[in-house]
Amino acid sequence: MFNLMRLIHRSFSSSPTNYVLQTILPISQLCSNGRLQEALLEMAMLGPEMGFHGYDALLNACLDKRALRDGQRVHAHMIKTRYLPATYLRTRLLIFYGKCDCLEDARKVLDEMPEKNVVSWTAMISRYSQTGHSSEALTVFAEMMRSDGKPNEFTFATVLTSCIRASGLGLGKQIHGLIVKWNYDSHIFVGSSLLDMYAKAGQIKEAREIFECLPERDVVSCTAIIAGYAQLGLDEEALEMFHRLHSEGMSPNYVTYASLLTALSGLALLDHGKQAHCHVLRRELPFYAVLQNSLIDMYSKCGNLSYARRLFDNMPERTAISWNAMLVGYSKHGLGREVLELFRLMRDEKRVKPDAVTLLAVLSGCSHGRMEDTGLNIFDGMVAGEYGTKPGTEHYGCIVDMLGRAGRIDEAFEFIKRMPSKPTAGVLGSLLGACRVHLSVDIGESVGRRLIEIEPENAGNYVILSNLYASAGRWADVNNVRAMMMQKAVTKEPGRSWIQHEQTLHYFHANDRTHPRREEVLAKMKEISIKMKQAGYVPDLSCVLYDVDEEQKEKMLLGHSEKLALTFGLIATGEGIPIRVFKNLRICVDCHNFAKIFSKVFEREVSLRDKNRFHQIVDGICSCGDYW
């Protein structure tokens, strides 16, 4: 707490003899004219004659200017003159301290209030929530309920924001019950906060039900449901919802567009992203950092790194998220040297400190860029405190991925053993994936079994272990793993690839027979296969994870979704037009080899984005250097 007594003494020891005005203006008029210091001097001269309107004007002026010391003088004057402020003025004091980030002082004002109203409680809850003190916000809400205070729509809208951060969905559902009980569920503020809470908790079905039941919708509620879909990776649903609401007359704001860009990034819809960018410019929306960061992320994930960098370079002020978006973009393209160069620039500028995400992007860039020793040095620097961020489990997982990607499986295994804490499923999963690529069966089997114990519901662990056994020809073990999956009702995420043509997404699954042009695609695939073999393509049968004969394996390889999408791209696009294909899982070795020879035979630039990174292929040469 500030030294009130010293300020009290200063308020009344200031000699007014040098203060001469021909006409003494009222304090409220001085404040409205921006003459705060004169108003404070007038307060000192009036002493105990100060009243409600003068204090109110002074507190509002101090609040507008975030003038902490001047506001403290006003508070000190109240105490010295034994003025007993009404609940309204005490609430203004609380809000003033909260806005000046003096939360302890704000809380003290609340605790000392003889009578509290809904505005007082809500102001304290709101400021705690806005500053990330979610537990404290919920504590104040609980005190409010115990003191028989009745929340209003603003209280509920504010406290719901804190539920997910601090206590998960359980408490949020209890508060939802109170909202229904007191008939606040139809209020637009409360409804928007409710659907935002459920969406952030992954309960998008409940969020959608709330959204559809709202008696009226504004841009906040519309943005909340779009953002909910985008945050959960339900990008198509987010895009459909945006188009629906736009057709219903919703006027998007910058937050809406930021959420839309997140969805377009996930779908890699570059043309749609460019259109959204044009809409933003045409509507002259505020170009806040959150929108610029979303644009950088969208262009990076859609493969247009040069434009992403241009946006980044032209930003008047960059946040940590801006730097991270650009670093992640370079990392996903395997451009490790560009990652390190940008990281050096960030540190040299000294305006924004690297955070945990920054270092994760840098380590990932080293991993994809074949710079293991550099990555290890940076990690050692993190441990030593050189970057102000200690390594977390994700950083350890990135080092395991880096060593495993380089084939240093034993070293990665030993690194895990030396971890200061128990390795998470993510860390072990990185090692299992590396064991599958480099056929390290013994370590992979041990890690895979352990992973299945840790997270028995994760289908990916079963699949990778099964694939490892299949690569080693251990078909009995493959069957055992698949039987285990059936017994536990664990289902694998189906692989799919997609390509955009004429503003439409065309999806393909393995051995797809559902596409409207399937007969044309399959006929073209047979023609392509002959030309590819003549050019030197040899199917990598080790990528078929079933115990069947070689002829059947070759047929299965030709049915992979990436190949079907490439074939459709060749049919649907004009000669020489680049073909861009996207896949939700990691591309297999055979499809990667196929795409390289495809680009050379048909003289097409091929861009493949899988779960991990981009592959830019020109004339048979891939940007990854066959290292991914």
UniProtKB/Swiss-Prot annotation:
PPR repeat segments: 51-85, 86-116, 117-151, 152-186, 187-217, 218-252, 253-287, 288-318, 319-353, 355-389, 392-422
InterPro entries: DYW_dom (IPR032867), E_motif (IPR046848), Pentatricopeptide_rpt (IPR002885), PPR_At4g14850-like_plant (IPR046960), TPR-like_helical_dom_sf (IPR011990)
Entry GO MF terms: RNA binding; zinc ion binding
Entry annotated with the keyword Repeat: yes
Domain of life: Eukaryota
Segments of this protein annotated with the region Type E motif: 427-502
Chain spans, region Type DYW motif: 534-628
One BP term from GO: RNA modification
Residue segments, region Type E(+) motif: 503-533
The entry's keywords: Mitochondrion, Repeat, Transit peptide
GO CC entries: mitochondrion
Record has Transmembrane helix as a keyword: no
Transit peptide, start-end: 1-19
Locations listed in the record: Mitochondrion
Pfam family, one: DYW_deaminase
Family according to the record: Belongs to the PPR family. PCMP-H subfamily.
Name of the protein this chain belongs to: Putative pentatricopeptide repeat-containing protein At3g13770, mitochondrial
Organism (species): Arabidopsis thaliana
Lineage: Eukaryota, Viridiplantae, Streptophyta, Embryophyta, Tracheophyta
Gene: PCMP-H85
